[in-house]
A protein has these predicted regions:
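A membrane-periplasm/extracellular boundary helix in multi-pass inner-membrane enzymes
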Residues: 162-207
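Membrane-interface helix-loop-helix junctions at transmembrane boundaries of multi-pass membrane enzymes
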Residues: 6-15, 122-130, 175, 270-284
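Transmembrane signal-anchor hairpin modules in multi-pass inner-membrane enzymes, especially those
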Residues: 1-22, 121, 315-323
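Membrane-interfacial helix-loop-helix modules of multi-pass inner-membrane proteins that assemble, modify
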Residues: 67-103, 207-208, 235
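Hydrophobic transmembrane alpha-helices and their immediate junctions
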Residues: 256-289, 311-319
Length: 323
């Protein structure tokens, strides 16, 4: 209702939004998964909302959720489910979930807290402290979850944000910076898909890449061969460990058209953030792209960079004007 009545869209914009929601809705019907539809609805509803306020809300929401879960585990209400790492890297490690059901889910929520914290505390005086706390949190959670995807993506976000804070004004002065970011984002997706589609078990190169990505290449390759890709997805029941990479899970389960629209939304977000000089948002978007090579959790409407597609962004150089 807000999108169509109160957001003051033009007729052309409303027709475009309606078409997108129709296509994503068809994908929801065929796949039985509402994640993409929820993403688009919430992002469209965020039109002209203050982006920094959204970051603040999500930060405290993620913080409260993590704290509540830990308290409930300590009180014996929730169970700390344990599992063992059976992959080559860190074989035999005990992994804790602390009330989230799976260690990777605990790592995912910590990742979301770090992402939102990096975007919520952008002031120069607080950047170093924010990054230091994020590093300590990432390693502490990794010690108990052994979630490599969450650790690597958290560290990537921290490093990229530090670089963005330093060279952001210089990047904003270069006309090639925005096309370069968009191209690199697409190149990363294309690289993973190429490796998955060309994957061969006997190759030492592919075996090394597969080990680094916690067997995601092998599972993705097998899924593409077994199930293929449909325009609007399907309710796929995997007979082996789930295909966790978003770049494989989305086209197979959610459908080609909804997947293209979703990543198109990500590209628009990166474009608007870069144009506004908000290179911290671009940095977190790239860290999220790294995480998506191993997990599909960011297909839920919790990845803050995608809200930059419609929300009001304060221009970094003066923090007064907005786009």
């Amino acid at each position: 209702m807000k999108i169509y009545v109160w957001d003051n869209h033009t007729l052309r914009e409303l027709l475009g939004i309606s078409l997108i929601l129709l296509l994503v809705g068809l994908g929801t019907v065929f796949s039985g998964n509402r994640c993409f539809l929820s993403c688009f609805l919430l992002v469209f509803s965020a039109k002209d909302q203050d982006y920094d306020k959204l970051c603040r809300f999500f930060f405290w929401f993620f913080f409260a959720t993590l704290l509540l879960n830990l308290l409930l585990v300590g009180a014996g209400v929730l169970e700390d489910t344990l599992s063992t790492r059976w992959e080559a890297i860190n074989f035999g490690a005990t992994r804790h979930s602390y009330g989230f059901g799976h260690p990777n889910t605990f790592g995912f929520w910590t990742l979301l807290l770090i992402f939102s914290g990096l975007l919520y505390i952008p002031r120069k005086g607080h950047r170093a402290l924010s990054c230091l706390i994020s590093v300590l949190l990432a390693f502490c959670v990794f010690r108990v979850t052994d979630s490599k995807a969450a650790l690597l993506s958290s560290l990537a976000a921290i490093v990229l944000c530090l670089i963005a804070f330093r060279v952001g004004p210089w990047l904003s002065s270069k006309k090639w910076s925005v096309p370069l970011c968009l191209g690199l984002y697409l190149l990363g997706i294309a690289a993973f898909l190429s490796l998955a589609l060309l994957y061969r078990e006997g190759s030492s190169f592919f075996s090394t890449c597969n080990a680094l990505l916690s067997d995601r290449l092998a599972y993705s390759s097998a899924a593409f061969r077994s199930f293929g890709v449909k325009l609007f997805g399907a309710q796929v029941h995997f007979r082996w460990d789930p295909v966790d990479s978003l770049y494989a899970y989305a086209p197979i389960c959610m459908g080609l058209i909804p997947t293209v629209l979703y990543f198109g939304l990500n590209l628009i977000s990166i474009y608007r953030a870069a144009k506004a000089g908000r290179w911290d948002i671009v940095a977190v978007a790239f860290a999220g792209a790294l995480y998506s090579t191993m997990e599909y959790g960011l297909m839920n409407p919790v990845h803050l960079p995608i809200f930059a597609a419609c929300a009001r962004l304060e221009v970094e150089k003066d923090r007064k004007s907005s786009v």
